[in-house]
Amino acid sequence: MKASQFFISTLKEAPAEAALASHKLMIRAGLIKANASGLYTWMPMGLRVLRKVENVVREEMARAGSVELLMPVVQPAELWQESGRWEFYGKELLRLKDRHDRDFCMGPTCEEVIADIVRKEINSYKQLPKNFYHIQTKFRDEVRPRFGVMRAREFVMKDAYSFHADYASLQTTYDAMYDAYCRIFTRLGLAFRPVAADTGSIGGTGSHEFQVLAESGEDVIAYSDTSDYAANIELAPTLPLKGERTAAQAELTKVHTPNVKTIESLVEFLNIPVEQTLKSIVVESENEGEIVLLLLRGDHEFNDIKAEKLAGVKSPLTMASSAAIVEQFGANGGSLGPVGFKGKVYADFATEKGADWVIGANEDGYHYTGFNFGRDAAEPEFVDLRNVVEGDESPDGQGRLKLARGIEVGHVFQLRDKYTQAMNVSFLDNNGKSQIMEMGCYGIGITRVVAAAIEQNNDEKGIIWTKAMAPFEVVIVPMNYKKSDAVREAADKIYAELLAAGADVLLDDRDERAGVLLNDSELLGIPHRIVIGDRALKEGNVEYAERRNNEAQAVAIGEIVARVTASLNG
């Protein structure tokens, strides 16, 4: 492709609102153009990258036995009402009516649609298992779209759905799709980790995320420094502490702590280690009118996903109202504790072996020092309530945990019968008996993969594309293409020979200054660059550089095509 026939639109500066490197570089390189908050046009250069990702995904889906179809973006409300997600999904689900006043939505996922298709088309165990996928534009009405295409309202997803006669079959396909995802992200040249994860709003049982490692990632993953264990921090469990409880040394003492309502201010006011404090979180019970008290160390981060799964706790997790707290404790938040509380109390594992805690006294402006479980309040039930921290024992018992940030680009779920039961997706088994199908679902954020790749692969000059994702494999940058016959003839000859060799080549024949052409080639991140100028040609050479190391070297003009094709095929 010649640049004069293509479309290149680059910027020297990124817009002020762009925070992430990927957002800045995608705008500057002209990969995307913003139309509204969270809505983007994929320009020709960006679309080439998107298609490269899609091609790899399609190849690996076919290898895994998944069959492509295409489902609608606009979906009928009755399917979502049947599954129970019409109300559950909340305002992120964009609802609309047609001219006949019928309810529809812009689908963020397609579980309901594919379940409806399968229940109409498949009725026998002889037709199972089946695995379908599509690549489609989605819409999720994000309350605060940000970070460019990383968290946009409109995005491209690959969704796959599998249906099975039994769980063993589901597990086989789940493993095959897990392996396919590993191949996809490896082929795309990404540094990633598969991690155990929560199922979230999709539901089901088993689940793994595929996280691209990046400091800008919104997710935190925990992994063992010894074994293969890895999980999203939301799911990574903490373990009960070993050994005996520390003996109590202090008496329970009420101290005046005026205007002290946070752990930080408590630590400063009493001049104590934060590890000696307990914080109280009060949530609604599944029994109406009752509340549950949750206790964890002041320096630990509360994990609401774990708390929601506790017996007796209302789901979804709901914080108790101020009125309910005052009614039950006689004090406001910031001064709460278990002394005298008659309701259910859970305490985190990390508090079980400690002694002489500092905790709220259930009186505004007062705290207790020297609090001990069993002596000053009944022993609570000790459970896992917090996020893991670096240095915690790995849940598999091998090594210690480390933390890293990641960008979720893929997610696989064992849905089991969450949707098939609700929507009566059944089949006749070999005995002629009706059975509910097992179901799996498998997603990849195609547009997010592009942004995540840039987060991992960039420098001060621009993007550094991996081999599989680059919009072009080679860029030829001729100096004075319009004015120098020698440069033009050499550029056209090399361009033609590379095309004949099967390379994906961009010949930048724009009538621009040399500095603009060179800067754009680095900003666009095309892996291989050939610079052709009159001075080098007089010596029989061209300049060749790989974008990842930017080390330019002179190569004989008669050898450059073989040199580049060898690198491309290596």
From Swiss-Prot:
Single GO BP term: prolyl-tRNA aminoacylation
E.C. numbers: 6.1.1.15
Catalytic EC class: ligase
GO function terms (MF aspect): aminoacyl-tRNA deacylase activity; ATP binding; proline-tRNA ligase activity
Superkingdom of source: Bacteria
Catalytic activity of the protein: tRNA(Pro) + L-proline + ATP = L-prolyl-tRNA(Pro) + AMP + diphosphate
Subcellular location: Cytoplasm
One GO term describing the cellular component: cytosol
UniProt key word Glycosyltransferase: no
InterPro entries, A to Z: aa-tRNA-synt_IIb, aa-tRNA-synth_II, aa-tRNA-synth_II/BPL/LPL, Anticodon-bd, Anticodon-bd_dom_sf, Pro-tRNA-ligase_IIa, Pro-tRNA-synth_IIa_bac-type, Pro-tRNA-Synthase_IIa_type1
Keywords: Aminoacyl-tRNA synthetase, ATP-binding, Cytoplasm, Ligase, Nucleotide-binding, Protein biosynthesis
Subunit architecture: Homodimer.
Family: Belongs to the class-II aminoacyl-tRNA synthetase family. ProS type 1 subfamily.
Function, in words: Catalyzes the attachment of proline to tRNA(Pro) in a two-step reaction: proline is first activated by ATP to form Pro-AMP and then transferred to the acceptor end of tRNA(Pro). As ProRS can inadvertently accommodate and process non-cognate amino acids such as alanine and cysteine, to avoid such errors it has two additional distinct editing activities against alanine. One activity is designated as 'pretransfer' editing and involves the tRNA(Pro)-independent hydrolysis of activated Ala-AMP.
Annotated domain remarks: Consists of three domains: the N-terminal catalytic domain, the editing domain and the C-terminal anticodon-binding domain.
NCBIfam families: PRK09194.1 (NF006625), proS_fam_II (TIGR00409)
PANTHER family documented for this protein: MITOCHONDRIAL RIBOSOME PROTEIN L39/PROLYL-TRNA LIGASE FAMILY MEMBER, PROLINE--TRNA LIGASE
Name the UniProt record assigns to this protein: Proline--tRNA ligase
Organism name: Neisseria meningitidis serogroup C / serotype 2a (strain ATCC 700532 / DSM 15464 / FAM18)
Name of the coding gene: proS
